Each structure stands twice: as structure tokens, then as C-alpha cells.
Curated annotation (Swiss-Prot):
Protein name as catalogued: Nucleoid-associated protein DP1429
Family: Belongs to the YbaB/EbfC family.
Keyword Transit peptide in record: no
Highest rank taxon of the organism: Bacteria
């Protein structure tokens, strides 16, 4: 086994991962709740970019429901971003589930 070849492969994979992470940061995923009355936009790295709330929900009598919908939409968006990230990283790893790979190569 050639150590220098393995090191080069690891370096190449690290570069590819960095490119994927950069690409994920540019992708916008929308999570929604309440039939689209609340939408949360996140990027592929799980950062919240925007929250949109329909005017009909902005009523102090509905505060608790609004909070629940914002939470649900946020979780939906973050789940979708995580799924996208797994899909993109899966292309790099040939579909192998390597949960520690991101930490190792970053």
C-alpha cells in the first residue's frame, strides 16, 4: 500500500468536499407548514435565510399556533437541507455512509 498515494487521494477528496460544501451554501431549500402559510428558507448548510409568514397568521390570538408553525417549517427546512447534504456527500463517497468523513477531512 502506497502511503503517498493514499495521502493524495485524501487530499483530493478533501478538495471535492470543500467544493460540495461551497455549493451547498449556495442552494436554497424551503420548508413549510400550515399548508404553506409559514415558509422557512435555509441553505444547504442549515443556515436560516428567511422566514415568511402569511398576513392571516399575524394575530395575537393565534400566537401559539404561529410559533408552532414556525417551528415546524424550520424543522422541515433543516431536514430537507440535511437530506440534500447527505445526497451530495453520497456522490463523493459512492453512497457509503461515512458520518465522520466530514469531520476528518475538514
Amino acid at each position: 500500500m502506497d502511503i503517498s498515494k493514499l495521502m493524495q487521494q485524501a487530499k483530493d477528496m478533501q478538495g471535492k468536499m470543500a467544493a460540495i460544501q461551497e455549493d451547498l451554501a449556495k442552494k436554497i431549500i424551503t420548508g413549510s407548514a400550515g399548508g404553506g402559510m409559514v415558509e422557512v428558507q435555509v441553505n444547504g448548510q442549515g443556515e436560516i435565510l428567511a422566514i415568511k409568514i402569511e398576513d392571516a397568521l399575524i394575530n395575537t390570538d393565534e400566537k401559539e399556533m404561529l410559533q408552532d408553525l414556525v417551528t415546524a417549517a424550520t424543522n422541515d427546512g433543516l431536514r430537507r437541507a440535511k437530506d440534500l447534504s447527505k445526497q451530495e456527500m453520497g456522490q463523493l463517497t459512492g453512497g457509503m455512509n461515512l458520518p465522520d468523513l466530514t469531520n476528518f477531512l475538514s
